[in-house]
Each structure stands twice: as C-alpha cells, then as structure tokens.
Amino acid sequence: KQLPHLSFLETAKEQSFMSKYEVADRYQLMWRFRTNSMFDIANYYSMHPVLLDEHFRSLPPIINFSNREFYGNRIRVMRQNNPNDKILEIVHVPDGKVDYDATRNLPEIEALVKRIHEIIVDNERENPDNPITIGIISPFRAQVEQLKISLSKVISDYMMEKHKIEIGTAHTFQGDERDIILISWAFANNSFPQSLTFLQKPNLFNVAVTRAKNKMINFVSKDFTDLPDGLFRSYLS
C-alpha cells in the first residue's frame, strides 16, 4: 500500500535495451522497468511472502485508520499513547477556498504557517535542546510550492534546518517520518471534483496519513458531512 517507484526512462530507450540484450518477447512485459520495480518482480516470484506486521513509528490514533482501511487490522502497533494527549487534530478553515485556477488554497496556507510558528515558538521555549521535527504535506504540487514560499517568510533557514522542516507531496515523504505532520488537504467548496478523486488515491492517501510519529494536524476547508463517501470523508469522521 505504498507508492510505486517512479521511472523517467523513456519508452524508446527501454525498448532499445530489450532489443540490445535480446530479452525474449514473453519476458518483456515483466521486465519493463517503467512499470515494474525489482521489488515487483521479487514479489511476483515469491512463494511465501512475509508481512512485516510490527509498526514502531506512529502512535495508535495515527496508524489505526490505515491499519483498518488498508491492512485489514493485521498491523500490530508497538507504541502506546497517553490518553490525555491530543494526537489527531482537525483544524477547520471556514474561509478556505481555492484560487482562480483551483490549484492553491491560501487561507489554509495562512492557518498552517501560523500554527507552525506557534509550534516552534513553544518548542524553543520549553525544550530548545530537543527540537521537534516537522513535516508538511499537501496532495497538490501548487499548494506545496506556495507553502514553501509562505513559510520562508516566517521561519528562518536556521529554524527550518534545526526542526528538519520538509514540505512536499506524499512522494516526498515515502519512507520518511517526522514528529509532527501537518497536512493541507486544500480541498474546498469551489474545488474541481477531480481534485477529490486525486487526493483519495489509496497509495497516496496511505503514505500521507502515516508519516507522523507523535501528532497529526489536518487543515480542511470543507465539512466532512458535505463530502461524498470515500477515504477522505471516512478519515475526517
């Protein structure tokens, strides 16, 4: 349920390698690197696949949704949380909307940047020698780029590096983690319906919501009760 590999190998180049090394026609579909990774091939030929079912990264409230939706509750969560901690948080942005070309949700960005500033100020005051690591995710590239611009105006390069602040799509965080993850979903009442289809792609969604170790903060501009059935509505509810 993770993201597949990304290949920038041109189709023509790939075919030329097939011809050069005389790969038989019956094997070419399997050995096309544009569509199959070495992991895919190993998995195809595996007689007895093993599920790595122990999860050490996230606190239970963070991983429980993916465990249920994607892994059939087969994952054993090895961490325990303090029931008094607010681990999952939803920040509703009532004036959130996407701009004229439906690529950026500026009110969400403003709310998220403000929250990050508060997190850093609190951490620097209370425990400056143990900096919280922070990740910022959005499903949409334009939102990511605007987040980088807006955050750079408020947070210094020194603090960005100290708190290992990374901003990107789910692809950026594949295999990575942070103490706190903030997600700007960027979907609003005036968003194109196709945007919802995109952000609910299972692999992308699963990676996005499982990068946090200790806390997840979701910024949303649309009430979940107004969303159609699907991953996004189920997650927010």
Residue positions per predicted region:
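Conserved helicase motor core of SF1/SF2 NTP-dependent helicases
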Residues: 1-237
